Design a protein with these regions (language model features):
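Active-site loop segments of alpha/beta catalytic cores
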Residues: 1-53, 57, 71, 75, ...
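N-terminal entry elements of small recognition
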Residues: 128-132
Length: 368
C-alpha cells in the first residue's frame, strides 16, 4: 500500500471510530485477537517455566522493552478496522502489585496470581490512603511508569500504546483480603459496609491515578488515545473491569461494586467496561451503569464455557440499543453465530474474531 493509501485508510479509521463511539447504526468494525506471542513476558514465563514469587527486581525492563520491540517487528499498524495498540506486560497483575499484594508466577500456566498483602485488615485503609498520597514512591508504580516511558521512546512513533491490564476495585480489595473473606464481609454489611466502601473507594482512586499516569507516559496518538482493542478516541480512553462480580449476587454487586465502576468511568473521556458472558444477564447491572455514569461502551467476552450465543442475543441486542458494544469470541462456533447476527445489531459493534494461530504459544492474551 502506498503512503497516500495508508494515510487515507488511517483517516477513514478515525472517522469509523467516531461513528462507533456515537453508536451509529450499521457500524460493524472487526479485528483479530493476537496470539500470546504479543506478550513477551508471558512467553518468557512459559518458556522458562518460571514459578514462585515474582518481585519487582525480577522484571528486567530493558530486556522486556527489547522483547516487545521484536514481538511487534513487521506488524502492521492496523488490525482489521482498528489500530494495533500495545500494552505493557499485561500478564503482570499490576494493580494488585501496586497495592501491596504478593505476586506468584505459574510457569507453564503462563500467568500470574496475586495473594493477600502482609497487612492486617484494620490497617488496610491507612495503607491505601498513604499509597494514594505517595504513589510516585511505589516500586511497582515506578516500574510501570518507567516501562511506558521506555516503550514510548522505542515504539511510540510506530504504534499507539495503551494502558496495561488493570483489574477493578473489587478485584483489588479481594486480592488484599482474600476473595472469600471479601464476600463474607459483604454478606454482613452491618459490621463491614463502611470498612469495605472505604477500601473500594480508595482502590478506585488508585486505579484512576495509575491509568492517567500511563496515558501521560504513552502520549497522544493522532490527537487522541487508543484503548485495549485499538479503538481510537479524541480523549482519555480506558478499559475497566470487575471479575469479582463472578462471586457476588446482583444485590451485592449493586450495593458494593457498581458505585465504584461509575466513579472510574466518570474520571475519563471515554471508557469501555469488560464483562464476562456468564454473568452479563444476571450480575453486571449494565442498565443502571449506563444510566448513572458516562460509560461509553460495554464489552462482552464470550467465555468458552459460557451461555451459547443464541441464548445471549437478546441481552446483546438490548445492550447495543443503549451503548456501543464490543464482542470478543474465543471459539469458531461463537464466531459463526455472531457473524450470522451482524445485521441485527441496532447500534455500533466492534467484533474480535478468535485467532486461528496454533501451537504452544497461541494461548489467548488473558483479559481477566
Amino acid at each position: 500500500m502506498s503512503d497516500e493509501g495508508r494515510l487515507d485508510k488511517e483517516t477513514g479509521l478515525l472517522q469509523s471510530h467516531r461513528h462507533f463511539w456515537n453508536n451509529s447504526p450499521g457500524t460493524v468494525l472487526r479485528r483479530t485477537q493476537l496470539t500470546g506471542n504479543s506478550d513477551p513476558l508471558r512467553v518468557h514465563i512459559y518458556d522458562e517455566n518460571i514459578k514462585g514469587e515474582f518481585t519487582p527486581e525480577m522484571l528486567d525492563l530493558e530486556k522486556l522493552i527489547d522483547d516487545i520491540k521484536h514481538a511487534y517487528q513487521g506488524h502492521s499498524l492496523l488490525n482489521g478496522d482498528t489500530f494495533q495498540s500495545i500494552p505493557l506486560a499485561p500478564v503482570v497483575p499490576w494493580m494488585e502489585a501496586i497495592i501491596g499484594c504478593h505476586l506468584y508466577s505459574l510457569g507453564r500456566g503462563a500467568s500470574m496470581v496475586a495473594n493477600p498483602a502482609d497487612i492486617e485488615p484494620g490497617d488496610l485503609a491507612q495503607h491505601l490512603r498513604h499509597l494514594l498520597d505517595n504513589l510516585s514512591e511505589n516500586v511497582w508504580f515506578k516500574k510501570l511508569g518507567d516501562g511506558y516511558q521506555a516503550l514510548a521512546e522505542v515504539l511510540g512513533a510506530k504504534f499507539p500504546l495503551t494502558h496495561t491490564l488493570m483489574r477493578g476495585p473489587g478485584d483489588m480489595v479481594g486480592a488484599l483480603l482474600g476473595h472469600e473473606n471479601l464476600v463474607g464481609r459483604m454478606l454482613k454489611p452491618a459490621d463491614n459496609k463502611d470498612f469495605l466502601n472505604e477500601l473500594l473507594d480508595l482502590c478506585a482512586k488508585i486505579y484512576i491515578k495509575v491509568a492517567k499516569m500511563q496515558l501521560e507516559r504513552t502520549k497522544e496518538f493522532k490527537e487522541g488515545y487508543c484503548n485495549w482493542w485499538g479503538l481510537w478516541a479524541p480523549g482519555l480512553n480506558v478499559r475497566t473491569q470487575e471479575d469479582e462480580a463472578a462471586f457476588v449476587s446482583p444485590k451485592l454487586y449493586n450495593e458494593f461494586l457498581l458505585p465504584y465502576h461509575i466513579q472510574e468511568a466518570d474520571a475519563f473521556d471515554y471508557s469501555a467496561f469488560h464483562m464476562h458472558s456468564g454473568y452479563v444477564r444476571l450480575i453486571y447491572n449494565w442498565r443502571d451503569f449506563s444510566k448513572k455514569s458516562n460509560i461509553s461502551a460495554f464489552e462482552v467476552a464470550l467465555d468458552p464455557s459460557g451461555p451459547a450465543v443464541e441464548d445471549l442475543m437478546e441481552t446483546l441486542l438490548e445492550i447495543n440499543s443503549e451503548k456501543p458494544l464490543i464482542i470478543d469470541a474465543t471459539t469458531d462456533e461463537q464466531d459463526k453465530a455472531i457473524k450470522k447476527h451482524f445485521g441485527d445489531f441496532p447500534g455500533s459493534v466492534l467484533y474480535t474474531e478468535p485467532s486461528s494461530a496454533q501451537g504452544l504459544l497461541s494461548f489467548k492474551q488473558q483479559e481477566t
